[in-house]
From Swiss-Prot:
Family: Belongs to the complex I 23 kDa subunit family.
InterPro entries reported for this sequence: 4Fe4S_Fe-S-bd (IPR017896), 4Fe4S_Fe_S_CS (IPR017900), NADH_quinone_OxRdtase_chainI (IPR010226)
Protein topology in the membrane: Peripheral membrane protein
Organism of provenance: Cereibacter sphaeroides (strain ATCC 17029 / ATH 2.4.9) (Rhodobacter sphaeroides)
GO CC annotations, alphabetized: plasma membrane
UniProt-listed Enzyme Commission number(s): 7.1.1.-
GO biological processes: aerobic respiration
Subunit structure: NDH-1 is composed of 14 different subunits. Subunits NuoA, H, J, K, L, M, N constitute the membrane sector of the complex.
Protein localization: Cell inner membrane
Its biological purpose: NDH-1 shuttles electrons from NADH, via FMN and iron-sulfur (Fe-S) centers, to quinones in the respiratory chain. The immediate electron acceptor for the enzyme in this species is believed to be ubiquinone. Couples the redox reaction to proton translocation (for every two electrons transferred, four hydrogen ions are translocated across the cytoplasmic membrane), and thus conserves the redox energy in a proton gradient.
Name this polypeptide is given: NADH-quinone oxidoreductase subunit I 2
Keywords associated with the record: 4Fe-4S, Cell inner membrane, Cell membrane, Iron, Iron-sulfur, Membrane, Metal-binding, NAD, Quinone, Repeat, Translocase, Ubiquinone
Binding site for [4Fe-4S] cluster 1: C51, C54, C57, C100
């Protein structure tokens, strides 16, 4: 009898408690700022692509969902002729963002990627490339690439000199 009364009281309290459900498409819950969602390719402040087609993002990807084809400009700079991500396979781990030396590939908090056909989840370079600088405004890879640190020796280091 006591168990039945406890159950009735519990149900009675829950009837008048505020609801915890949200009508999703109309109302959205706030996401954490570090939510890993859709992947984008960013640009330099000059408007050039940051990606140098080094293929480190594809090598770091544990599910092999990134495909990069490298091309070269007449001045010798590498760029991705083709950059494809298969979001049907992507697990949004963020390893590609960590591996990128130019901060070109970044994960955004946009998590709404659902589609009815798997083929529509393969994004090409044109779909991924945004006009902004992403999380690192003002960063230019080519301004810091290959520059020496002031006060450091520029000669090659002999490993024998490092041994005790």
């Amino acid at each position: 009898m006591k168990g039945i009364l406890d159950s009735i009281l519990r149900v009675g309290r829950m009837i008048f408690a505020p609801t915890k459900t949200v009508q999703y498409p109309e109302e959205k819950l706030p996401l954490a700022p570090r939510t890993r969602g859709r992947i984008v390719l960013t640009r330099d402040p000059d408007g050039q692509e940051r990606c140098v087609a080094c293929n480190l993002c594809a090598a770091a990807c544990p599910v092999d969902c990134i495909d990069v084809v490298k091309a070269e400009t007449p001045d010798g700079r590498w760029y991705p002729e083709s950059f494809r991500i298969n979001f049907a396979r992507c697990i949004f781990c963020g390893y590609c963002e960590e591996a990128c030396p130019t901060s070109a590939i970044q994960l955004t908090p946009d998590v709404e990627l659902a589609d009815y056909r798997r083929g529509f989840l393969q994004y090409e370079k044109e779909d991924l490339l945004i006009s902004g600088e992403g999380k690192h405004p003002g960063y230019r890879y080519w301004d810091v690439a290959g520059k020496t640190i002031a006060g450091k020796a520029q000669d090659p280091v002999d490993p024998k000199d490092l041994c005790p």
